[in-house]
Amino acid sequence: MQLHFLSIVSQKEIMRFPLLFLCLLSVQPLVAEDYPPGTFEYTPRVDLGLRPVVVDRLPERTLNLPAGFKVRFFSGEVNHARFMAFDENDVLHVGNFNTQRSGYWHKDPWRDATVLAMPDFNRDGQADRVYVAADDLQLPHSIAFYKGHMYVADHDKIYKMYDGDGDGYYEQREKLISVPGIMNRPSEHITHTLLFDEQKEKLYLHVGSGCDLCREDDPERATIMQFNTDGTERRIYASGIRNAVGLDLHPITGQLWAAGHGHDREGRSLPPEWVSIILPDTFHGWPFAYAYRSWIDFSDPVYSKEILPITAQDSALVRKMQRPTVLVDAHLGPMGLHFYTHEQFPQRYKNAAFIAFHAGTGSSFDPGYKVSVIFSNPDGTNARIADFMTGFRPDPDKGFYWAQPMGLVTDSEGYLYMSSDLVTPGIFRIEYDPQ
């Protein structure tokens, strides 16, 4: 097992206090759960011994997976595939942005975006056909099925959809919830992820910030919201969350986990991206701090103009921050977060969390563009992270990448599906065959 240790001082501090830095290197690295406020540790890494595997139905492409795993290209009949969900008949559905005319990060004024259905009734690992299950949408990022209905998160509302005649097309809808939508501001976050907690009969919804770093006028931005499943009892469940696209419930504890994005303007290595257990009424740092109470560098004139002065209330919020469960390299863009609960994969993956990293640009030390897996105790302690599927960026020293991991989901048989929204839009299926 390979452990990565992060110095708790910046490069400027190393230059100012070289003896202090040498002392830090001479002591044992802190356990990831034990580091003090104002510092942070990257989560230790595990090496799964990835091997090259040719992608079935994409013979010109190779990905790297642990021994015994293989990957198929399930379908490429999609414009920009976002998050996925299976209905009660085990038919895969995927949110499909149609941005050929409107631009990728703008709502579609023609309302050409759709939800696509991709049945695989003969179970050969390839979609039998692809058809429109719902249309007249703008940015349908996230989908969920609950008690026979399909729920779709568009940029400004959550729809509850009905398939009255059972033909697979959801011809009726009602607006369940209105949410903060697009404001056409720089660096705003425009998608929403929804998640049902069937045990507690609650609905969670991530609402990203309307900027990279600023003081929001709308208290519901940069939060995770909670509702009853009928849309009532609206409340802010947790705040200080710039953009937590990945949401899932731990299969043992039932606790909400989220994967979040850090701010943009603090260099190649800061701030780390994170995964955390999200408890009710907690604050997670934005726009003042990151990781475990590490203050943002407000010497940046853009940030200082937006945030300063820091108030006593701001400081009190930062003092409430808890250590994240997982910290990884900056700017990797964590997207889908999915706990694996099936038996098809080896036992070590049972109840582990898979996470899709959508980015890994020149601003990051990690090549990115990959799927990783988090191993931990149910309460998040003793967390370790491992690369599970890499190769979308074949040469880390070059900018070329041929797909961007987005969503993750499993079917009833335990196959893992990954969507890619750009370069090679489509759905990939990962399966385990030790032979």
Where are the predicted features?
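Surface loop/turn motifs at the tips and blade-to-blade linkers of beta-strand repeat domains
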Residues: 75-77, 132-136, 177-185, 236-240, ...
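Residue position within the beta-strands of beta-propeller blades
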Residues: 93-95, 152, 204-205, 258-260, ...
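Hydrophobic core register within WD40 beta-propeller blades
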Residues: 84, 143, 194, 244-247, ...
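Beta-rich catalytic cores
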Residues: 80, 111, 129, 139, ...
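Residue-level detector of Asp-centered blade-edge/turn motifs that repeat once per structural unit
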Residues: 87-89, 145-147, 196-200, 251-253, ...
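Beta-strand-rich domains and repeat architectures in extracellular enzymes and scaffolds
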Residues: 40, 49-58, 72-101, 333-336, ...
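Asp-box/WD-like beta-propeller blade repeats and closely related beta-sheet repeat scaffolds
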Residues: 130, 134, 139-140, 144-146, ...
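Beta-propeller domain segments
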Residues: 34-66, 191, 209-212, 222, ...
